[in-house]
């Protein structure tokens, strides 16, 4: 019979091979897991397999390219085994972009509050994502961290060691940044806003992007004669 798990394996291998085409493979993220069906027993031929796929990239343009290429990989996998394919796409977070001028304001304030040896200035972009990425696609942002030397966040052992530093001093940092931005009739804030080139010029453009990548597509189907019908981009 038609084995959808085999089709999924072909598709996942094809998508994995896309990493070799990326000029920024260290920040490209593709991950996939079979989350449903795929065979109830070793000797069963699975008629339905569900794969959950996630993508990350440093820019929206790269993310769109990856989405297109990964769709093609799964279309190829389905076609190779003669099975149908439905692709359900939902948008996650936009890649995070940071405003260098806003970073410098944060650093200037930090130098008044923290010892020099405890301040790290890096412009390296992280592939980590959160809703700050969506905000940064429209307005200047900074995603700074204030730590107290305790266990790393996102770990079981994470806890606060220095409550004053993490509460009061961190609050002083944020207020200090606001004072710098809003002083002199918000001159610095206006300068940063004018220099920033957002991913989306308008909120409407951002919403259109979100809508474009929220869809369900019957990417591979067959007519009554068994002729394949491709509906992917």
Predicted regions and their residues:
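Midchain, well-structured core segments that form catalytic/ion-binding scaffolds
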Residues: 1-104, 108-110, 124-133
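Zn-dependent metallopeptidase/amidohydrolase metal-coordination segment
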Residues: 120-177, 181-233
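Surface-exposed helix-capping loop/turn segments at secondary-structure junctions
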Residues: 20-24, 81-85, 116-118, 181-190
